[in-house]
Amino acid sequence: MSKSYTVAVAGATGAVGIEMIKTLEQRNFPVGNLKLLASARSAGKTLKFKGEDIVIEEMTSNSFKGVDIALFSAGGDISKQFRADVVKSGAVMIDNSSAFRMEDDVPLVIPEVNPEDIKKHNGVIANPNCSTIIMLVAVAPLHRAKKLRRLVAATYQATSGAGAKGMEELQIQTRQLLNGEPIEPKAFAHRIGFNLIPHIDSFLDNGYTKEELKMLNETRKMLHDDSIQISCTCVRVPVLRAHSESLNLEFAEEITPEEARAILAAAPGVTVVDDPANKVYPMPVDATEQYNILAGRIRQDISRNDRRGLDIFVSGDQVLKGAALNAVQIAELL
């Protein structure tokens, strides 16, 4: 990229927005002019970019004039409110919310998985759900090699998935519980300190949550294959940052753990961390602030009578690859 771009970050003061700004700087994205947009209560404050203080502006319908790329992480309602303004201005909206992901004319993109879909955009490109990204960066290369037929996932999702307020609640409740103080859950349905909550997003009539069906529907859309059977259970865990997932995979063809390790070692965006004998395996503490997804505990599924099944454990930074980094990578491909 030789030219420079005017980039807007909408939702600049949120956890993902702040990470977007840092990622633009770390990856030397050719930003000629950076506009930081947020609500009226944040207007006038400043955030640093490349050593300079950038004043945050209130987001209005006129904020996108002259903008080339608008990175949105301000919630689905805000994305819907400003979509027409962004597209009319000639900018490309890269949206981190779930507002447009399943629309037929909106590409849903992970650059390591389906970069070719970017070309189909009509002004809006959707960032997938964080758990879907972390899963598919590891699963897609295996699917390309051996064709995935069935996937069962259990997630261990950090409090960062609920934003800064989620992480703060974990820290506060941990202190309160250690001191024997009463707690009052606010960011989550139940206490998150020293607890697990098998409830992310709202429940549907079939007993699944919206989060679980996002992983199903988004996977099928990005792999362009509605025949893949998928079931997920999403669980919030008392971890500050970085999600983990236990994946049981069934393929059309036989695959060994050795083959899987070789495929993943050669795949972009994946680091194989798989030496259990020496206590080496993916953990959220090691995935935090890392660009790559960590993949390990790769083993044959012994519940099967053939070699078409694998079990894999992955960890990835939800705020980075699960959100901000993926959005910036999409911008790099435009």
Predicted regions: what is each one?
Residues G193-L240:
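Oxyanion-binding "anion nests"
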Residues I228-L334:
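C-terminal active-site/capping subdomain that shapes the small-molecule cofactor and substrate pocket
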